[in-house]
Each structure stands twice: as C-alpha cells, then as structure tokens.
Design a protein with these regions (language model features):
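A short, flexible N-terminal coil/short beta segment enriched in small residues
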Residues: 18-22, 90-95, 99
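Axial heme c-ligation environment in periplasmic c-type cytochrome domains
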Residues: 58, 130-133, 151-155, 203-209
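Short Cys/His-rich "knuckle" micro-motifs
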Residues: 76-80, 97-101, 150-154, 174-177
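N-terminal export/targeting leaders of redox proteins
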Residues: 1-52, 56-60, 64, 68, ...
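The canonical Cys-X-X-Cys-His
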Residues: 63-72, 84-94, 140-146, 163-170, ...
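Primarily the internal scaffold of c-type cytochrome electron-transfer domains
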Residues: 2-6, 94-126, 171-222
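Soluble extracytoplasmic domains of inner/organellar membrane proteins
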Residues: 124, 132-180
C-alpha cells in the first residue's frame, strides 16, 4: 500500500503535541501569576484619597494609637472609619487654616462624610471580623503591614484564600501578646522554635479554635 503521509509527518505530529502541551502549561502559569498579581489582588496599589491622610505621619511620627480612629476594632466586625469630628478634634488647632484640609473642614461644616476610597475591599462572599482576630492575638501589622511607614495607604497582603488559610492552619505562627496587638514594631511572624512555642502558648491562652473550625467553609463564607 502506498504511503499516504510523508515520513516527516511523524516529526510534525510530535512537535504539534509537545507544542500544545508547552502552550497549555505556559497559559496555566500565566493565569496563576495573573491571579496572584497586583492587577488582580490590589496588593501594593496605593489608593488616592480625597484627602491624602498619611498613616506614616499620624501613626509613625505622632504615635497616634490605631483605636483613636478605628474605634470599634476590638468590639465589632468592622474596625470603623473615623468621623470628621475625630479629625477636627486635632485640626481645629493644628493646620486649622491649611488649604490642604479644606475638604475636611467642608465636611465638618456640612455634615457630609468624606468619600474615602476603600483600601481593603473584601468580596461580599467573604466574612471577616476584626474583633475576633484582635482578641485572639492577631496584630494589626500582621494583615495590614507597617502602616506607620505608609505615607499613602495600600493593601499589604493579597487577601486571597490561600493567604487566610496560611494563618488558619497554623495560627501559632502569627499570634502575639495582647499588649502588642497595636504595636507596629512587633514581629509579624513567629519563625524560630522559641517563637513558635510562644505562639502555641498564646494559642492555648486565647482559646483559639482548632483547624476543624478555622478551616471550615462556613467560618469565612456565610
């Protein structure tokens, strides 16, 4: 029987198969990298605000405690955003006539809230409660990064599920003393054997739930 295909067809078929596999793997790699990139997660992206509030100045330079502005962080799901009255407690006397703060004064006069842009925007299907994390030994900087070094606030973590699960699977890696919850200089992760042992102690003292609860879908998706 005469040969229908040229003998080079075998090589062409192999090249096609290998090429398809390579392209498939490459596309999968690109998809994974895009999913983890700042383009998708918003990590490292500075958000321009109506008034460029500097955490570096207020927290880092002036030493203002997180709870002065985020008053409900220890008692509610939301940490809370400060009202304009909170801003004006200081700025009636400090920078009282600065053009830079005119939007703040206008908000104070009219009673219309400042339209802050959300920095950490969790999807609606994810439930997060600030108070339970704070009261179980998770510090602000563990999730939010060193805000005392941020002239403009940005999202320091991906906020993706694998990031959340890293802590829920091994909370002892990220716990700290309760008196250090709002301390920006405290370590964000326990790495050495001694630090991990401390983490295990805090985990027991704070009665942190086990993996069965922390990894349950309903814990974060309600």
């Amino acid at each position: 029987m005469p040969q229908i295909f040229h003998h080079s067809t075998n090589a062409l078929a192999k090249i096609t198969i290998y090429g398809a596999v390579f392209i498939g793997v490459a596309l999968l790699w690109v998809a994974v990298e895009l999913n983890r990139s700042s383009w998708n997660t918003g990590q490292w992206v500075e958000k321009q605000q109506p008034v460029q509030f500097s955490h570096k100045h207020h927290v880092g330079d002036d030493g203002i405690d997180c709870r002065y502005c985020h008053t409900s962080v220890e008692t509610a799901a939301s940490a809370g955003m400060p009202s304009t009255n909170t801003c004006m407690n200081c700025h009636k006397q400090i920078w009282a006539d600065s053009p830079y703060l005119e939007p703040v004064r206008a908000s104070f006069r009219t009673g219309k809230p400042i339209g802050w842009i959300r920095v950490h925007d969790l999807p609606d299907y994810a439930y997060f409660n600030h108070s339970i994390h704070v009261n179980k030994g998770v510090g602000c900087s563990t999730c939010h990064g060193r805000v005392d070094d941020m002239p403009i606030a940005y999202q320091a973590a991906t906020l993706q599920m694998e990031w959340c699960l890293a802590c829920h699977r091994q909370p002892e890696r990220f716990l700290r003393p309760k008196e250090k919850i709002f301390d920006m200089t405290w370590r964000t992760e326990n790495k050495s054997a001694e630090e991990l042992q401390e983490g295990m102690t805090w985990k027991a003292d704070y009665k942190v739930q086990g993996r069965a609860v922390l990894e349950s879908c309903s814990t974060c998706h309600r």
